[in-house]
Amino acid sequence: MKFLILDVYPSNDWRLVKDTAGGYGTGNDFGNSLFSQTVNKFVSKMISMPPMYAIYIYTILKQKGFVVEYERDLNNRKAIDEADYIIMPSSIIAHESEVKVLKDLSKRNKKIFVVGVFSSVLKNNYKEKNSYIVPGEPEGFFLNLTYSTQNLDSFFEGEKNELNPSNFVEDLDALPFPDWNYYSKKYPLKNNFLGFNSKIAIPILASRGCPYSCFNYCTYPLQQGRKVRLRSVKNVVDEINHCMQAMDTNKFVFRDPVFSINRKFTVEL
């Protein structure tokens, strides 16, 4: 069984990051002049990362023994054609491009799991004959999924397609450490400016969820829920040590929306 995580972007020439803004994504396009295009290209290489859940999904599927790839190149027809199931991250910044590719894949009878909070907000845009919109945190969905062809195919049938279960991961320690080593060999994994400290920058989450009242307009509670869930300090430290040994970097970017909400936890970490 082969899975392809197909991460669609309208351009590689300026910074587009789907993980920011609570999974909606953000981008910087400084203009069309020669200078602006140079800045666009530079920034796109200096600040670059995928949606974290995409690499969690990759790692979960890999550990379960499946053939899985992460790909941004739509010209890689071989990977697309050979995939039994395609997993497509969604975002506001690449919405039009994602939907266009989704429609094309559905017409070719490819089965597509659409992941990410934005597809749950704009369901009608991502709803196709051969698509299933995964609600909640997709890591929970793929961690607990029954991997038989019969069960997987059932998600693309009418009745099951309308199910809307919660997939929030209560025990964050149950998640594997994302395989950033695989990703960084194919694409930039950076978070620096003006070339300072250009080591690989590992995104990491010590907690998920945000309880504050700004949930009325903020995207993070949509993505992670309002309940704050903490990993154990040991689990976070073990991931840091794992990445330092596997990737020879000591640069980490904590992506928690409320990293310091629990002072005791933060100080211990």
For each predicted feature, which ranges?
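Short, glycine/serine-rich, charged loops/turns that create anion-binding
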Residues: 10-12, 119, 209, 258-259
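Short, solvent-exposed beta-strand-terminating loops
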Residues: 3-29
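Glycine-rich beta-alpha loop elements in corrinoid/cobalamin-binding modules
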Residues: 53-171
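Aromatic- and Gly/Pro-rich amphipathic surface segment
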Residues: 26-55
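Radical SAM [4Fe-4S] cluster-binding motif and immediate context
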Residues: 177-269
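N-terminal [4Fe-4S]-dependent radical SAM core
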Residues: 15-16, 151-203
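Short hydrophobic segments within beta-strands
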Residues: 6-8, 88-89, 115, 255
